[in-house]
Amino acid sequence: MKTLILLAITSLFSLSLTAAEKEAVALFNGKDFTGWTQKGGVAKYTVKDGVIVGTAVAGTPNSFMCTEKLYGDFVLEYEYLCDNRLNSGVQIRSNMFAKDTTVDLGNGKTRKIAKGRVHGYQVEIDPNKPDRMWSGGIYDEGRRGWLFPGQHGGDAARFTATGVKTYKPGKWNTVRVECRGDSIKTWLNGVPRADFKDSLTAKGFIGLQVHGIGGKKELVGAQVRWRNLVLKELK
């Protein structure tokens, strides 16, 4: 009888895990941008062999390929491969207003955000440089700047040192992001990166950034790639 009960419990546990795994969904269908829309600048986004390719163009601001659906609490995993001359990132819990809007940043501070300006938390993709390698850090795009390392903790020099050791130059790198309530955590290739609490924005879209390059002609055509974008909403 004990054996049967144990088998039943094990079976139920396995079913529970299977159900949890089924909740994870691919954000990208591998063929086209169904369910996505481009915001901000006019950098070129294409699909090649199941990979999203973002290509830098001159004279345009930061560009973002964004999910149409908004997400609050979730675990997001993806891989990226970036030209080491480029800065990029992935927006989470981000938004864009239809008109100029003044937002309360807390501590008596406000900021006017222009209509059409993508803003919100960004998981950084940094060039691999010994003086600053903050991939996996969190930058508050269009609002407060660096949060981690920065306003919410993290030693900049130590963060860079760990980043240089963890990052794989010229190869696919894996990122995991966990947003739960006011907690935001990230991992780069399995190594913990950002870990802090912030409650300014609870929900928003996911966005893939191609950073503006201004008039730097040598960066025209430089690319950043993403694949295997999988998200599991948390309840």
Residue ranges of predicted features:
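Carbohydrate-interacting regions of secretory-pathway proteins
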Residues: A19-K235
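Sec-dependent N-terminal signal peptides
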Residues: L4-F13
